[in-house]
Amino acid sequence: MIDQYKHQQLQIGLVSPQQIKAWANKNLPNGEAVGEVTRPSTFHYKTDKPEKDGLFCERIFGPIKSGICGCGNSRASGAENEDERFCQKCGVEFVDSRIRRYQMGYIKLACPVTHVWYLKGLPSYIANLLDKPLKKLEGLVYGDFSFARPSTKKPTFLRLRGLFEEEIASCNHSISPFFSTPGFATFRNREIATGAGAIREQLADLDLRIIIENSLVEWKELEDEGYSGDEWEDRKRRIRKVFLIRRMQLAKHFIQTNVEPEWMVLCLLPVLPPELRPIVYRSGDKVVTSDINELYKRVIRRNNNLAYLLKRSELAPADLVMCQEKLVQEAVDTLLDSGSRGQPTRDGHNKVYKSLSDVIEGKEGRFRETLLGKRVDYSGRSVIVVGPSLSLHQCGLPLEIAIKLFQLFVIRDLITKRATSNVRIAKRKIWEKEPIVWEILQEVMRGHPVLLNRAPTLHRLGIQAFQPTLVEGRTISLHPLVCKGFNADFDGDQMAVHLPLSLEAQAEARLLMFSHMNLLSPAIGDPICVPTQDMLIGLYVLTIGKRRGICANRYNSFRNYPNLKVNYNNNNSKYRKDKEPHFSSSYDALGAYRQKLISLDSPLWLRWNLDQRVIGSREVPIEIQYESLGTYHEIYAHYLIMGNRKKEIRSIYIRTTLGHISFYREIEEAVQGFSQAYSYTT
């Protein structure tokens, strides 16, 4: 369908019977309306032509050959005269044969039939709206019992037919013949309701706004009751509250989409265009047909049998009519979802029929295999590898992919900057990989996001936007924190890269799809960007340090004060491996690491700001060392306090490793960057 903004889109949902008929009906010049499929036949066995009013009828679905009717007459398509657009003899319209790919038909059902997706789906929409157990609704739909109509003012004779044997077993001998009498049809229409027709009546009587109001009142009452202390009662109350919320959401959705609840019960069954369920003739008189054709045949046969019984209702036993209604319901269920009744339906060769649900869903379904799995322009694909130096919103693109994706933009800028005179010369410069090409490419990429997608796209985080950067090699670099949203890992997974072209697409990518703006799970609200697997192992190795006991601190010489500047060029005097060095700042520690004087896990003492948490701590020192000048050192498990003779704290040193320092600096820079970004936005 095409919306008001002329965007092509596909929408799956409920439609009214009038809309189904409008999709299929065509009015012939003689006033006859065609579109209803009434016969289960396909092609005539002698002429190999489609049967009239059958599943491949040319009057309903259009001609097999463009501009040629069933009689063999031809006329150019698009004639202005309405009478000349149709064959006067066979009624086939002179149009292109491609109409058989989208022209639909319909089957007029002799009895209402529930849509199995809305009855047996999880959750069951019909059961939610009616606030009734699913098992009871299934028993009603499949004729296991009936219920009395509440609208009648006369005394009802029948309550639950399925309970006759238990409640009034003594009357069985007199009740059973009653269902075979000619007057039962009148009695049935007046007093009892059964099958999908009963469901349709109840859905039609619903007032969705009253449902929302009543459900809200009941939810508030349950909320006010609080917890009773009984675990079973509290659990039932929680389940009921969740059900009420779902019921209100469902009713609100029906109101917003202008959908009537009774449309979940079918009176007209749409018939797919014949080109979507073809019959193929092979050599040796072999015929290969779609399973959907066989399922449609079953529906039409059972529906015709039911219509015949209803016409002869005075002679047909009621049990036979109700049994035939159940068969029609089961045939439609098999057409829509073959496994809805437990075991899937099989043909004579013990082969499982593929229903409409089987054709649509799954990896080999119509959407994922035929529509979503196609190559598109301005896209590429490669294996992903970890990019630890990237920011969360960045991805690394190989040079080959980047120059292919942004080739037109590079050519435009080459011509605009007068580096070339025409497109052919610009392409040659790109082919020869001149330096100016890479400069322009980086400039173009700086302001243009790309989209990364990993199949299968099961939720919206399966495709996110990134700022591209050029990397060497032939793989796409990705920040490890965004892998959880894609459900990806670095064991050979492939990802596709797409280039948004229009300004609207680029704005949407920047405002809604950037990875640093999708930090929470849309389903449950938990953080989606959390370190996992190799990141946790790396952080553990970075911060574990050498587990030297406190004895190493007690008997370590603390004469190596930061007052004595460390001479990095002299490795003999100040830096012996049996001592834990002191540093006045983290920059000094990093400098020593770069000169390979210390390692990442080597314990060291780092001068720290006067922290009130450390000063006010009640921890007892392990040892106190006094010097001749009156100064002292209080040695604790993880820090050291230096004081003067006046008992004033002069400095504090913490015992740490370079790994801890690096990790702390990274977190500090990230927090500061976030604070600056937040201050800019506010």
From Swiss-Prot:
It is found in: Plastid, Chloroplast. Pfam families: RNA_pol_Rpb1_1 (PF04997), RNA_pol_Rpb1_2 (PF00623). SUPFAM superfamilies: beta and beta-prime subunits of DNA dependent RNA-polymerase. It comes from the Eukaryota. Its EC number is 2.7.7.6. Keywords: Chloroplast, DNA-directed RNA polymerase, Magnesium, Metal-binding, Nucleotidyltransferase, Plastid, Transcription, Transferase, Zinc. Its cofactor is Mg(2+); Zn(2+). SMART domains: RPOLA_N. It catalyses: RNA(n) + a ribonucleoside 5'-triphosphate = RNA(n+1) + diphosphate. The keyword Nucleotidyltransferase applies. GO terms for biological process: DNA-templated transcription. Binds 1 Mg(2+) ion per subunit. Coiled coil: none annotated. Mg(2+) binds at residues 489, 491, 493. InterPro entries: DNA-dir_RpoC_beta_prime, RNA_pol_asu, RNA_pol_N, RNA_pol_Rpb1_1, RNA_pol_Rpb1_3_sf, RNA_pol_Rpb1_clamp_domain, RNApol_RpoC1. Zn(2+) binds at residues 69, 71, 87, 90. GO terms for molecular function: DNA binding; DNA-directed RNA polymerase activity; magnesium ion binding; zinc ion binding. One of its GO terms (cellular component) is mitochondrion. DNA-dependent RNA polymerase catalyzes the transcription of DNA into RNA using the four ribonucleoside triphosphates as substrates. HAMAP family: RNApol_bact_RpoC1. In plastids the minimal PEP RNA polymerase catalytic core is composed of four subunits: alpha, beta, beta', and beta''. When a (nuclear-encoded) sigma factor is associated with the core the holoenzyme is formed, which can initiate transcription. PANTHER family: DNA-DIRECTED RNA POLYMERASE (PTHR19376), DNA-DIRECTED RNA POLYMERASE SUBUNIT BETA (PTHR19376:SF54). Belongs to the RNA polymerase beta' chain family. RpoC1 subfamily. This is DNA-directed RNA polymerase subunit beta'. It comes from Hordeum vulgare (Barley). The lineage of its organism: Eukaryota, Viridiplantae, Streptophyta, Embryophyta, Tracheophyta.
